[in-house]
Amino acid sequence: MEHFDVAIIGLGPAGSALARKLAGKMQVIALDKKHQCGTEGFSKPCGGLLAPDAQRSFIRDGLTLPVDVIANPQIFSVKTVDVAASLTRNYQRSYININRHAFDLWMKSLIPASVEVYHDSLCRKIWREDDKWHVIFRADGWEQHITARYLVGADGANSMVRRHLYPDHQIRKYVAIQQWFAEKHPVPFYSCIFDNAITDCYSWSISKDGYFIFGGAYPMKDGQTRFTTLKEKMSAFQFQFGKAVKSEKCTVLFPSRWQDFVCGKDNAFLIGEAAGFISASSLEGISYALDSAEILRAVFLKQPEKSNAAYWRATHKLRLKLFGKIVKSRCLTAPALRKWIMRSGMAHIPQLKDYPTRFTSPTSRM
């Protein structure tokens, strides 16, 4: 039975970043359900926007995005829509439009060969015994059993590692649904949509490489019905759909309290969305995935006597920042406060009257 210093479950942005940073410094094995290349197999449903904080992480690491990861067009503003109030506002944002699946595969490709990576693999069982973590996984058509000193859960919203460590822990979850359509809008745009009759979270749209992606986060019970209802409402705001080319869905976490951030125990650690590190106000998680990976790298290389306590302390600033996003989310999803903010015109950038399309309902107050 082979033994490793670190076993990483999941190679999204968090797991890939950590594996790359530990390569050559510790003996690492990493398991991922995505294929090594191509579009077959699992791909993460995601709007695919790289936030400024994530961009800073790449600056820190000296990395630049390859052209095949970057999507077209690049959009510098978000159209925020309050459906009930029939209000639309335009706010500046500095996101990079990316192809999320290509981005994830590129992140994996940066992991050096010294890390033992298993693509298209499935983690079947984990347990702790004799001060070691045991992992049974299936890859290349057969089951393997390894042990590790440290176990890292970078396996997202449905984290197997988090469920094992905290079987009674409850965190609010939504079903994220999005559909792809052939782009029909004369001017590409990115939007953020609030409609409390549909969801107490939010919905979104993004133009990407000739497609129009429309999606949102909805209650688990009747998410599909709510998604369909919102699509019908958006015709009043000049959203154009047509026949769906592709439909996607996944579970997304929505932290709503300080206790929703869990970092691990017993030499097992959680990073990225598995730890609850996702913005409640935007559902953006890549930047926090990269930041938590960097924090855990530093903890591992220092090898403190109590690694879990050290990681908990080191993530304090990150958790405070994310708690601030919870407060912001409560403001944005409060109808009266949101309506007041949008009507005030704060930070709104008006568009010229002869702009080709305005994406507002006839009753909007601009």
From Swiss-Prot:
Belongs to the CbrA family. This is Protein CbrA. InterPro entries: FAD-bd (IPR002938), FAD/NAD-bd_sf (IPR036188), Geranylgeranyl_reductase (IPR050407). It comes from Shigella flexneri serotype 5b (strain 8401). It holds the Pfam family FAD_binding_3. One of its GO terms (molecular function) is FAD binding. Disulfide bonds: none annotated. Gene3D superfamilies: FAD/NAD(P)-binding domain.
